[in-house]
């Protein structure tokens, strides 16, 4: 049976602490935003302890929410001047588009990479590039299906503009979807953000757009799967 590699000279742990550590390393932690939903499912199961259908429904709901709000650790690349995926999902667009007008930027198209998150994907968002948050703006809107091109213009969204140490601006936009009705963003103007750190979450299916500075070298293509904080989307100029 295959075993986890250990440093030379170290002795393997045994007993309950070892088992607990194995479980913790296998099951990803839960984002705090999901705890009320999981508690609701467990509460339903508790109320229906004498009814197997109610109990089963509650446990299934709690399990589904635990899976949806999972928050696995990620290791971003240590390469300089790269932009990583801000979310898990499928690259649904690689094109050029004007950034959200509420940011007050010139109305000129920039390279854009859009990632669509299904309900089965990890739904936390990661910082795509290290730098300072120079703008964080929420805009109310519609709740069209997030895989539609017009969703980036019409839907509720939250935009974060990040200025890198070399002066490049990268914009990451959380977009609500047909089912997603709640955008969570913890970043604030003036925050120093580290690449790969978790900064927000969108509940139940959504999309994340990343706008790049001119001259960036895009390294992904439409239809490709992306892993948040680890897949390199582009190299900055």
From Swiss-Prot:
Keywords: Cell membrane, Decarboxylase, Lipid biosynthesis, Lipid metabolism, Lyase, Membrane, Phospholipid biosynthesis, Phospholipid metabolism, Pyruvate, Zymogen. Is synthesized initially as an inactive proenzyme. Formation of the active enzyme involves a self-maturation process in which the active site pyruvoyl group is generated from an internal serine residue via an autocatalytic post-translational modification. Two non-identical subunits are generated from the proenzyme in this reaction, and the pyruvate is formed at the N-terminus of the alpha chain, which is derived from the carboxyl end of the proenzyme. It comes from Mycobacteroides abscessus (strain ATCC 19977 / DSM 44196 / CCUG 20993 / CIP 104536 / JCM 13569 / NCTC 13031 / TMC 1543 / L948). It comes from the Bacteria. Pathway: Phospholipid metabolism; phosphatidylethanolamine biosynthesis; phosphatidylethanolamine from CDP-diacylglycerol: step 2/2. Binds 1 pyruvoyl group covalently per subunit. HAMAP family: PS_decarb_PSD_A. The modification Pyruvic acid (Ser) is found at residue 206. This is Phosphatidylserine decarboxylase proenzyme. Catalyzes the formation of phosphatidylethanolamine (PtdEtn) from phosphatidylserine (PtdSer).
């Amino acid at each position: 049976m295959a075993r986890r590699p250990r440093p030379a000279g170290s002795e393997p742990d045994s007993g309950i602490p070892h088992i607990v550590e194995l479980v913790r390393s296998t099951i990803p932690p839960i984002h705090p935003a999901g705890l009320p939903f999981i508690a609701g499912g467990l509460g339903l199961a508790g109320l229906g302890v004498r009814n197997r259908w109610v109990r089963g429904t509650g446990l299934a709901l709690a399990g589904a929410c635990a899976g949806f709000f999972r928050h696995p650790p990620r290791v971003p690349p240590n390469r300089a001047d790269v932009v990583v995926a801000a979310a898990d999902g499928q690259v649904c667009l690689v094109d050029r588009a004007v950034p959200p007008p509420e940011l007050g930027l010139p109305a000129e198209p920039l390279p854009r990479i859009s990632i669509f998150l299904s309900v089965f994907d990890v739904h936390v968002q990661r910082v795509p590039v290290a730098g300072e948050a120079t703008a964080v703006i929420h805009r109310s809107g519609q709740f069209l299906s997030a895989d539609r091109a017009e969703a980036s213009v019409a839907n509720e969204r939250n935009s974060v503009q990040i200025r890198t140490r070399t002066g490049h601006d990268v914009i990451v936009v959380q977009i609500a979807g047909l089912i997603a009705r709640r955008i969570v963003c913890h970043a604030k103007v003036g925050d120093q953000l580290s690449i790969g750190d978790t900064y927000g979450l969108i509940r139940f299916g959504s999309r994340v757009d990343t706008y790049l500075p001119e001259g960036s070298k895009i390294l992904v293509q439409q239809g490709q799967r992306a892993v948040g904080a680890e897949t390199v989307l582009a190299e900055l100029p």
